Amino acid sequence: VSIDQYLREQFPTGAFTPLNKTEDLDVLVAGCGTGQIAIASAQKYLGARVLALDLSLASLCYAKRGAPDDVAARIEYAQADILKLAPLERKFDVIDSSGVLHHMADPFEGWRILLSLLRPGGLMHIGLYSEAGRRDVWEARKFIAEHGLGSTPDEIRRCRQKLLETPLASLTRFTDFFTTSECRDLLFHVQEARLSIPLIKAFIINHKLRFIGFEFGRPSLQQYRNHFAASGWAWPDLDRWHSFEVENPSTFSGMYQFWIQKP
């Protein structure tokens, strides 16, 4: 489908200006990891030409090997640091950066650099960790520090066992908890910023961006749509979303996943 059709399906009441592009859609995936988002972008959006960047050469090699034949020719891979992309002369219609910016000392610095690469009227999908949604993760990190637990495979197994004996057994809602490498990233990552809807809103206002809406899986999406409609709330109302998250802190336990548009 076109990027416009995809967004209309996700956000029937969301306001955005259509790109009206079904070919030569330049997409940047900033922090492609294993390549899933780059592949999905190439498969999902009509006419997508994807540049997939990552700091890790190992991740890039893995991503390139995993690209299906039907989209491999439309995905270009390159090693790069987001914080050093400002001089890049290429501009993009769509930028996707999910699960990356919150691992920077200043996530908003990285976000600003990505905005500079987005064409006027361009669309951006961002994924950021929620402080409220990951409160038990922060508590687990305190627990780990207090007990002097390390991040070797044996220590991670011991750590998980100890956590299961406490109220922090709630961490089992994260599938990452059960895999050693992913659990290391979940509980032992050395750099992780804490973000909130008011902080995101302030950035959006300061940069005159249009907030289109939060993205959810289908069951949750319909549930939230019904709740907002019954309450008479507008879907892009960030103040309402903040109030909703305060009352329902697990709403964004994965990440804030949302779309914005540059003026």
Name each model feature, range by range:
Residues A86-I95:
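A short acidic, Gly/Pro-enriched loop at the edge of an enzyme's catalytic core
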Residues F108-P120:
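A short glycine-rich, Lys/Arg-flanked "PGG" loop and its adjoining helix->strand segment in the class I
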Residues S56:
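Conserved SAM/SAH-binding beta-strand->alpha-helix loop
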Residues E165-P263:
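Rossmann-like AdoMet/SAM-dependent catalytic core
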Residues V1-L25, A40:
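Conserved alpha-helix/loop element of class I SAM-dependent methyltransferases that forms part
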Residues T34-L46:
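Conserved SAM-binding loop of SAM-dependent methyltransferases across substrates and taxa
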Residues V71-L83:
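Conserved SAM-binding strand-loop segment of SAM-dependent methyltransferases
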Residues L123-P167:
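Conserved class I S-adenosyl-L-methionine
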